[in-house]
A protein has these predicted regions:
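Structural signature of the two symmetry-related core transmembrane helices
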Residues: 74-88, 170, 275-290, 370
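Helix-loop boundary and gating motifs at the non-cytosolic
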Residues: 2-52, 208-236, 242
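Residue-level signature of mid-helix packing/kink "hotspots" within the transmembrane helices
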Residues: 52-60, 144-145, 254-262, 343-347
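Cytoplasmic helix-loop-helix junction between adjacent transmembrane helices
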Residues: 102-142
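C-terminal membrane-cytosol helix-exit motif in multi-pass small-molecule transporters
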Residues: 170-189, 376-384
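Helix-loop junctions at membrane interfaces in 12-TM secondary transporters
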Residues: 89-103, 292-303
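Juxtamembrane intracellular "pre-TM" segments in multi-pass secondary transporters
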Residues: 1-6, 185-212
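Transmembrane alpha-helix termini and helix-breaking/packing motifs in multi-pass membrane transporters
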Residues: 32-36, 146-164, 348-364
């Protein structure tokens, strides 16, 4: 049995690699760019929350329509193209109002492409789906590492303006469309049913998994709180390094995440995705608990590495496992539903974490994350036992 990756998997992974280089060039400077346009902290939060909401809601709709017309590639191409075009326009923004519209439009592109793209990945890798999704996430994260480094070089060393950097990132994004053109879909019959009927056709095992994954997502708050915890510690230990060290730790997290994603995907094909997810949810809980007690550079190096391993165990494996549970004719709808529910759960997750951080204390945020990780682990173990029986 060959483990060779299919052409579609490689092409779509290159697409995500280039797109993440483009996006991660922009993300580190976006808050400063918005502030330079007159947007205060509330506006920055509004842009982040609104864009995520728009993206999440569209995913189930795009997934359904890719099933309905029997074509996924047009959604992938148009989604990536819209995101790149929005980045170009963002570079010409003169007020924060423009930024609100254009960042949201960029997320519309993400909402259109994610579920159909994941459906193509699943349909192109029936035997080694975990390996395929793992490779895709590894390429995606590798692009994020390069993009973040380029942003730092372009801004701090070359002294380029926000507008020039964002424009250049948009151009890089357009190069991601070339591999999409080479993707070849399998022939599929259009599914002539309403969205409501397609949702009702989703199997019970899949629905239960989405519930458990969304419970985990409620505790899987934004990575920024992990960075803030490190920054708070180093403001006391070494104020001069309070910004540099947390950023380097974030890069370290991404390196570990990228390094483990493909091996974990391959392992999930061999030993089963249930074991990988149980390990991932449990390790996330352990990592959050560790952040409660961390107070040294050595501790943070270990914990950010564990955070990266946990993400590699969870992210691609959840997508592959969800794909396993859905028949091909409604896979776009199913993966769109999965992405939508997880995306919507992520919003209150960070609001709860932020409220605990501000009103109770930083440690409370990580206690909450550990608790939700333990709950998700327990529920998934019960789910697996019931499914096996």
């Amino acid at each position: 049995m060959s483990e060779k990756l299919s052409k579609n998997v490689i092409l779509l992974s290159i697409v995500s690699f280039l797109t993440d280089i483009s996006s991660e060039i922009i993300f580190p400077i976006l808050p400063m760019f918005i502030a330079s346009l007159g947007g205060a902290g509330l506006i920055i939060g509004l842009i982040g929350g609104l864009s995520d909401s728009v993206s999440s809601i569209l995913k189930v709709i795009a997934g359904y329509w890719s099933d309905r017309i029997g074509k996924r590639k047009p959604f992938v191409f148009f989604g990536y193209g819209l995101s790149s075009f929005s980045k170009i326009l963002l570079s010409f923004s003169t007020t924060w109002h423009h930024a609100v519209v254009l960042v949201s439009l960029e997320r519309v592109g993400k909402g259109l492409r994610d579920a159909p793209r994941d459906a193509i990945l699943a349909e192109s890798s029936e035997e080694h789906r975990g390996r395929a999704f793992g490779f895709h996430r590894a390429m995606d994260t590798s692009g994020a590492i390069i993009g973040s480094a380029l942003s730092f070089v372009l801004f701090y060393y070359l002294g380029l303006s926000f507008e020039t950097i964002i424009f250049a990132a948009g151009i890089i994004g357009f190069f991601s469309l070339i591999p999409v053109l080479l993707v070849k879909e399998k022939d599929k019959k259009p599914v002539k049913s309403s969205l409501e009927l397609s949702l009702k056709a989703l199997p019970g095992d899949f629905r239960m998994f989405v519930i458990i994954a969304s419970i985990f997502a409620l505790g899987n708050f934004t990575y920024m709180f992990f960075i803030l915890k490190a920054q708070n510690v180093f403001l006391i230990l070494n104020p001069a390094m309070a910004i540099a060290i947390p950023l380097l730790l974030y890069v370290w997290f991404n390196i570990i995440y990228a390094a483990f994603s493909m091996p974990v995907g391959t392992l999930s094909d061999r030993i089963g995705r249930r074991k990988i997810l149980i390990a991932g949810y449990g390790l996330f809980a352990l990592t959050c608990a560790g952040f409660v007690f961390s107070d040294s550079l050595a501790a943070f190096i270990v914990l950010f590495a564990l955070y990266g391993v946990a993400y590699s165990l969870i992210d691609a494996t959840q997508r592959a496992f969800a794909s396993d549970l859905i028949s091909e004719n409604i896979r776009g709808t199913g993966l769109g539903t999965f992405h939508t529910v997880i995306g919507l759960a992520a919003l209150p997750a960070s609001l709860i974490a932020g409220s605990l951080w501000q009103y109770v204390g930083p440690d409370a945020t990580f206690v909450y994350g550990a608790g939700m990780g333990i709950l998700a682990t327990a529920l998934f173990v019960l789910y697996s036992l019931k499914s096996n029986n």
